[in-house]
């Protein structure tokens, strides 16, 4: 992969509104979004987003003000987000699985002036979740749809009508003043290791990084991109609809992952591009009616975000017919992508690594003293490059702890670089547990357990043990719901891995607890394990 060529794009196209204007000049009549059988062209998307920007300006939003979005994957999400950017604002996406108190905390800490949120979703009327919790800094709550209860201030149509209070000229002047290095979004990390922190990222790195990403993974002009990854996550936002718009592709939003619905939509809409975490594809592969669907339109996919079992790449190619499968690695603090495999990489490389550094990115692995380790040696993954975050919002201490004086981002992930510069992530530093003095990395054990013929999904956690300090517990979801023979499973483990890696406990579950991004929630899983183990006799 070559270095990013900033000169290939004019400076005016290195802001998100500028990028959209550039794409509209080339693909004005092409479908940008298809939802419920209705199409929004690129020209219409720009028109709607500028109306949304004018409405926000009429509500008092100034350049640099934060505007929050709390909704599933809907066309209005994209319109509103583009509107925030076109008003010079900073987008604050909120996870739809958050409870009211969690959302209120982020709204208060970000001092969001306006919230655009879904109405009825997941058995909740979302504005009601903020009853008694709404921060005083939150001036307006706009609810999508028509239903306006007292907890909301206006619906989407009423909001868009506010555009009349600001002229098109004033909005375009605001848009023209946006600079590529202005903050575009404030994304709060998932909080799997503590209280969520707000990651600030600018326009320029998002555009350059995901232009490079798109060119490699096979997202092209005219691709039909089914976005299951939530828009509030970088995988659904930046590697999702932003990347699609950059390339002149068509976005097909999907609100909730359901294997039956996804398979049907791939067939009916002739979807060609479908990224997602491993759990998405494992769920599709486990669908009993998989062979009844015509998936021949699927050409390309990208996976990552958690452990990728080598067998999964093979099954995606052979059973789903996706020939162009690549893997990638990134985190919110680096804009969502740092390394990437290429289509020309062999199956073993794609299955066992997450690729090499994006153009303009440096990757190294270091020991506990911060010294670089050699090829094949494990160490903490450090990243440096143009797309590293601007910092954590109003948290200098956390920023300094994460980005060192030389500009290296300390990821907290453990990885290995090979002689070619390809990265393999082995685990999270904080997920590691120690069995009798031996370091155990759950992702490494999960990778091996995924090769067991009866395992569909697996996650490993460490639990306290009086004799060994900690021992492993494997939580298994079997293929087609077969009952796992635990003695035979343990015997298989002993034959395939070092004895200290063999799980002491095996729990068969109907499903693993995941968040809206389909990442396994290890803290929730650990609680399930503790509850289950407390009720059964422990082995000697």
From Swiss-Prot:
Q: Recorded E.C. number(s)?
A: 6.2.1.41
| Keyword NADP among UniProt keywords | no
Binding positions (ATP): 189-197, 413, 428, 519
Pfam families attached here? AMP-binding (PF00501), AMP-binding_C (PF13193)
User: What GO molecular functions are on record for this protein?
Assistant: ATP binding; medium-chain fatty acid-CoA ligase activity
Q: Which UniProt keywords apply?
A: ATP-binding, Cholesterol metabolism, Ligase, Lipid metabolism, Nucleotide-binding, Steroid metabolism, Sterol metabolism
Q: Name one GO biological process term.
A: fatty acid metabolic process
Catalyzed reactions: 3-[(3aS,4S,7aS)-7a-methyl-1,5-dioxo-octahydro-1H-inden-4-yl]propanoate + ATP + CoA = 3-[(3aS,4S,7aS)-7a-methyl-1,5-dioxo-octahydro-1H-inden-4-yl]propanoyl-CoA + AMP + diphosphate
InterPro entries given for it?
Answer: AMP-bd_C, AMP-bd_C_sf, AMP-binding_CS, AMP-dep_synth/lig_dom, ANL_N_sf
Recorded name of the encoding gene: fadD3
Looking at its record, which EC class is this enzyme?
A: ligase
Source species: Comamonas testosteroni (Pseudomonas testosteroni)
Q: Where is the signal peptide?
A: none
Q: Know the name of this protein? A: 3-[(3aS,4S,7aS)-7a-methyl-1,5-dioxo-octahydro-1H-inden-4-yl]propanoyl:CoA ligase
**Mutant lacking the gene: phenotype:** Cells lacking this gene accumulate 9,17-dioxo-1,2,3,4,10,19-hexanorandrostan-5-oic acid (HIP) when incubated with 1,4-androstadiene-3,17-dione (ADD).
Q: What does this protein do?
A: Involved in the catabolism of the rings C and D of cholesterol. Catalyzes the ATP-dependent CoA thioesterification of 3aalpha-H-4alpha(3'-propanoate)-7abeta-methylhexahydro-1,5-indanedione (HIP) to yield HIP-CoA.
Q: According to the lineage, what is the superkingdom?
A: Bacteria
Regarding protein family, the annotation reads: Belongs to the ATP-dependent AMP-binding enzyme family.
> Would the keyword ATP-binding be found if you checked this record's keyword annotation?
yes
């Amino acid at each position: 992969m070559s270095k990013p060529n900033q000169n290939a794009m004019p400076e005016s196209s290195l802001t998100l509104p500028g990028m959209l204007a550039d794409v509209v000049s080339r693909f004005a009549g092409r479908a940008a979004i298809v939802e419920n059988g209705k199409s929004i062209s690129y020209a219409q998307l720009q028109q709607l987003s500028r109306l949304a920007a004018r409405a926000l300006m009429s509500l008092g939003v100034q350049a640099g003000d934060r505007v929050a979005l709390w909704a599933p994957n809907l066309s209005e999400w994209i319109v509103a987000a583009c509107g925030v950017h076109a008003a010079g604002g900073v987008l604050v996406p909120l996870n739809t699985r958050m409870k009211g108190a969690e959302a209120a905390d982020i709204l208060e800490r970000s001092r969001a002036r306006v919230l655009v949120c879904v109405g009825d979703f997941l058995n909740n009327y979302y504005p009601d979740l903020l009853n008694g919790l709404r921060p005083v800094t939150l001036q307006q709550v706009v609810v999508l749809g028509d239903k306006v209860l007292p907890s909301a201030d206006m619906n989407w149509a009423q909001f868009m009508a506010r555009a009349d209070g600001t002229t098109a000229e004033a909005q375009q002047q605001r848009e023209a003043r946006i600079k590529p290095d202005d903050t575009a979004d404030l994304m709060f990390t998932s909080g799997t290791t503590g209280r969520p922190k707000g990651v600030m990222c600018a326009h320029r790195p998002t555009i350059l990084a995901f232009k490079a990403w798109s060119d490699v993974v096979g997202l092209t002009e005219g691709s039909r991109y089914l976005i299951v990854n939530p828009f509030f996550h970088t995988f659904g936002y930046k590697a999702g609809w932003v990347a699609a718009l950059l390339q002149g592709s068509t976005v097909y939003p999907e609100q909730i992952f359901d294997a039956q619905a996804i398979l049907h939509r791939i067939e009916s809409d002739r979807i060609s591009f479908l990224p997602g975490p491993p759990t998405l594809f494992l769920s599709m592969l486990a669908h009993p009616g998989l062979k009844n669907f015509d998936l021949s339109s699927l050409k390309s996919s990208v996976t990552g975000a958690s452990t990728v079992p080598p067998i999964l790449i093979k099954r995606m190619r052979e059973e789903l017919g996706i020939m162009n499968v690549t893997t990638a690695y990134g985190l919110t603090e680096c804009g969502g992508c740092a390394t990437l495999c290429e289509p020309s990489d062999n199956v073993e490389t794609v299955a066992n690594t997450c690729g090499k550094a994006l153009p303009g990115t440096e990757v190294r692995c270091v020991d506990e003293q911060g010294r670089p380790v050699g090829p094949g040696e494990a160490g903490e993954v450090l990243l440096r490059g143009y797309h590293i975050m601007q910092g954590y919002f109003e948290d200098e201490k956390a920023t300094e702890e994460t980005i060192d004086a030389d500009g290296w981002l300390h990821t907290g992930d453990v990885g290995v670089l090979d002689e070619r510069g390809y990265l393999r992530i082995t685990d999270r530093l904080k997920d590691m547990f120690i069995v009798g003095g031996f370091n155990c990395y759950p992702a490494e054990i999960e990778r091996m357990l995924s090769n067991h013929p009866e395992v569909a999904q697996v996650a490993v956690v460490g639990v306290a043990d009086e004799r060994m300090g900690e021992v492993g517990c494997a939580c298994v979801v079997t293929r087609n719901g077969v009952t796992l023979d635990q003695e035979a499973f343990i015997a298989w483990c002993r034959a395939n891995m070092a004895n200290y890696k063999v799980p002491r406990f095996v729990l068969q579950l109907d499903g693993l607890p995941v968040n809206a991004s389909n990442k396994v929630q290890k803290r929730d899983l650990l609680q399930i394990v503790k509850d289950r183990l407390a009720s059964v006799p422990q082995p000697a």
